[in-house]
Amino acid sequence: MDDTLFQLKFTAKQLEKLAKKAEKDSNTEQAKVKKALQQKNVEVARVYAENAIRKKNEGLNWLRMASRVDAVASKVQTAVTMKGVTKNMAQVTKALDKALSSMDLQKVSAVMDKFDQQVQNLDVHTSVMEDSMSSAMTLTTPQEQVDNLIVQIAEENGLEVMDQLNQLPQGASSVGESSTRTQEDQLSRRLASLRN
């Protein structure tokens, strides 16, 4: 299980590197577009622009994949933690069986206290696991926060992005992402129904 966790984290890092490389390539292509336009060569600029868009989309896809792999790594980490808690609970149960068979009230009381403590720890771990799984399952952040961050960065760099943000469909972080959003909403509802 630990090897799986390591491999998932390693894969997520590789995907993030690929996303950065694609973004760098996109920026290079955009510089070529600018140069071609300065030379009044629109056809060449169009080819470079297509390359820039393709590379940008490729980078976004790598980044989405990295995010999903990271979410799976979080789930595996939670499973490893729960495995340890379960092992501790099994040990306490065995100790309780031994104490009950000898009927030594002091031992029974001590084991019951330890068992209560383990149950409380399990409740805390379960709560943390549910919180991390719900955040990992949705794979989204509130749209308002995303928009605010984009506006903040744009203002810091003197960029105009409000028109572009207004063109995106409500609740989507990029064009063509509404089907992904629907799937994520369905997964969130299923997770909520499993909790109840």
From Swiss-Prot:
Main location: cytoplasm
Subcellular locations according to the entry: Cytoplasm; Endosome membrane
Pfam families associated with the record: Snf7
Keywords: Coiled coil, Cytoplasm, Endosome, Membrane, Protein transport, Transport
Segments carrying motif MIT-interacting motif: 185-195
Transport keyword on record: yes
Membrane topology, record value: Peripheral membrane protein
Database matches in InterPro entries: Snf7_fam (IPR005024)
Chain segments annotated as coiled-coil in the UniProt record: 5-41
Biased composition (Polar residues): 170-181
GO cellular component: a single term: multivesicular body
Region (Disordered): 170-196
GO terms for biological process, alphabetical: endosome transport via multivesicular body sorting pathway; late endosome to vacuole transport; protein transport
Gene3D superfamilies: 6.10.140.1230
Quaternary structure and partners: Probable peripherally associated component of the endosomal sorting required for transport complex III (ESCRT-III).
Physiological role: Probable peripherally associated component of the endosomal sorting required for transport complex III (ESCRT-III) which is involved in multivesicular bodies (MVBs) formation and sorting of endosomal cargo proteins into MVBs. MVBs contain intraluminal vesicles (ILVs) that are generated by invagination and scission from the limiting membrane of the endosome and mostly are delivered to lysosomes enabling degradation of membrane proteins, such as stimulated growth factor receptors, lysosomal enzymes and lipids.
Family according to the record: Belongs to the SNF7 family.
Protein name: Charged multivesicular body protein 1a
